[in-house]
Swiss-Prot record:
This is Small ribosomal subunit protein uS2. Belongs to the universal ribosomal protein uS2 family. The keyword Ribosomal protein applies. Pfam families: Ribosomal_S2 (PF00318). HAMAP family: Ribosomal_uS2_B (MF_00291_B). GO terms for molecular function: structural constituent of ribosome.
């Protein structure tokens, strides 16, 4: 779960945006500028990233869910792969308004997605006309693209992890309304407002995005492993206590 300064430098996490596109609220995390590009102070970023990793691990150890959100072209594949590796839901296509604040409606769409997938797998569509089957295929593709990453989500998540707050303002606003903690990568051109665990850093480089997403995924896997170990320990202690009581009788 550990991340080093060297890894962050090699991934280009320190490169911000052009100085004319900046948010003054990111000033505390900016080291300076070079060739009209802001340079992010990784000495500030590293401990903040580590705090975010600790939080992600804690959520996972409590058997919580963290929703990964990254819909930018250079983030999509990474977000989907790392979330899947960690066994967590993700949104790598367009964020649908109300995904969190109107989850009841989203749940209905998720049920439709599952029902359609089951019907297709069972061969039910073979009984339909060619036109009807084609329409169903298109509808299923649309639902899969929009909701495929959250099809196993049974309720609102315990936290969300966002890459690029500018792209996902609606997601952060919805999380804030529901009191869901937000972990987010914030570049120099955006405000960190609404983010509980800020990771000041480059949100455009795929190498940097991979470093953040892999770190969060690793932290989640560690947390899950801890949770399983605690359960096994509790079961073992319970069995030993039962044996001791049996001997006493």
């Amino acid at each position: 779960m550990s991340v080093t300064m060297r890894q962050m430098l090699e991934a280009g996490c320190h490169f911000g945006h052009q100085t004319r596109f900046w948010s003054p609220k990111m000033a505390p995390f900016i080291f300076g500028h070079r060739n009209k590009i802001h340079i992010i102070n990784l000495e500030k970023t590293l401990p903040m990233f580590q705090d975010a990793l600790k939080f992600a691990k804690q959520v996972a150890s409590n058997r919580g869910t963290i929703l990964f959100v990254g819909t930018k072209r250079q983030s999509r594949e990474i977000i989907a792969e790392e979330a899947a590796r960690a066994g967590m839901p993700y949104i790598d296509s367009r964020w649908l308004g109300g995904t969190l604040t109107n989850f009841k409606t989203v749940k209905g769409s998720l049920k439709r997605l599952k029902d359609m997938a089951v019907a297709k797998e069972a061969g039910d569509w073979e009984k339909l006309s060619k036109k009807e089957a084609l329409t169903n295929d298109r509808d299923l593709d649309k639902l899969q693209k929009a909701l495929g990453g959250i099809q196993d989500l049974n309720g609102v998540p315990d936290a969300i992890f966002v890459v690029d707050v500018g792209y996902h303002k609606i997601a952060i606003t919805e999380a804030n309304k529901l009191g869901i903690p937000v972990i987010a990568v914030v570049d120099t051109n955006h405000s960190p407002e609404g983010v509980d665990y800020i990771i000041p850093g480059n949100d455009d480089s795929s190498k940097a995005v991979l470093l953040y997403a892999r770190g969060i995924a690793d932290a989640i896997l560690e947390g899950k492993a801890n949770s399983v170990q605690e359960i096994l320990t509790a079961v073992k202690e319970g069995e030993e206590e039962f044996v001791e009581e049996g001997k006493a009788e």
